[in-house]
Amino acid sequence: MKPVAARVALFDLDHTLLPIDSDHAWGVFTTTIGWTDPVGFARRNDEFYAHYKAGTLDIHDYVRFAVDAVRRQGRDAALAARERFMADVVAPALREPALALVQAHRQAGDELVIVTATNEFVTRPIATAFGVEELVAVELALGPDGWINGEIRGVPSAREGKVTRMEQWLAARNLDWEDVECTFYSDSVNDLPLLDKVAHPVATNPDDRLRALAKERGWRILDLFEKT
């Protein structure tokens, strides 16, 4: 058997390391600061979230919707709002069991990667809060002015796209799946393609469908906290 070159711990973010959905929470936050209509935006935000949970989300449509306010407000206002979002919403949602899980893999010498279907604008500072440098998130295309234009750059890291993006991540390091021993923590059946790919899938705070599947397949189940 070929020896592995590295051990890699992969973490989904929303409802896995966080008890909230950061993408949805950011949308709610934009209504509280007056960037979006609280009724119309909330309705569409909830509709997109329902599609995500059902596995029917069109991520391109969603990202256009989700980053529209950021695009319109411009860089300086968006970065200032994100800093406030981190302080008011994300920081109170950080939980010791999740921080300890990441730290345990760090102390074991594992490479740490957050792999999320939420966009990089929202998730980069969250990854930093967990002390994780490697972030595989939905990358946002930039317009001629160097600011977000509402489109996705490259392959979105959702569903099967998480496998593709991780393969790109590995290839950039001259590695393949055979070269690494991967553990992946996720709460959602949407992540089944990547859970199936890794050596050690861990159903973490799993939704009902993933919990049932994990029991059927004998996968480890980890409950870090109650979802909100």
What is the meaning of each model-derived region?
Residues L13, D76-L79:
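Catalytic cores of transferase enzymes with a strong primary signal for eukaryotic protein kinases
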Residues D23-W26, Y62-V63, P144-E151:
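Acidic/polar active-site rim loop that often engages polyanionic ligands
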Residues I20, A42, T56, H60, ...:
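Electropositive phosphate-/nucleotide-binding environments in soluble metabolic enzymes
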Residues K2-V8, A80, A87-T228:
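C-terminal cap/substrate-recognition subdomain and adjoining C-terminal extension
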Residues A25-W26, E47, D61-F65, A81-F85:
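A general alpha-helix detector
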Residues F48-R75, E139-P144:
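Short, compositionally biased "basic patch" segments
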Residues M1-L57:
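Active-site neighborhood of HAD-like aspartate-dependent phosphohydrolases
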